[in-house]
Amino acid sequence: DDHDFDEEIREIFVEEAEEVMEAINEYFPKWAANFEDTASLLEFRRGFHTLKGSGRMVGAKVVGELAWAFESMLNKVRDKVLAPDQVMVNLISECLSVIPGLVEDFAGRQPPRINTSPLMAAADAVCRGDVLTTLDVAKAAEQAHAGPAAEADETAAAEAAFDALAASLAPVATAPSAEPA
């Protein structure tokens, strides 16, 4: 039965995610305290890689895409394209703080309670070489924790503004043009 298979895969993913988070939580603080600790960097980066792959495979897209954004950033640190700093540590910490809730939401077949877009955008900005501040990371975290509802409110506000603009332009668009005599 497909339902039983789906449940089994879901349970395996949740167990694996918990194990991966344990490893990340072991190695990330070591690296955060000493950026020269390449072995720890590689270990916790592998955790993001695993979450990306297994999340995508089982349909935990939000977890997979968030993990991919951070794995990409960590790949650049590993390859010495990006120099780590305390802002990056803060950003990774914020990411790690939301993953367990996202996994829990997936396990319970609930929509994600976290809007991961601001955290992914911050990681992408770092990958592009943008300089983020601690305040930028705090804002991204605040927006993430505001949840998908805040994103929906912003979308609704933008749609309402567009509708109002379109309505104000409609009379201009439909007015008969004066033909020269």
PLM regions: where:
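Non-catalytic helical tethers at domain boundaries
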Residues: 1-181
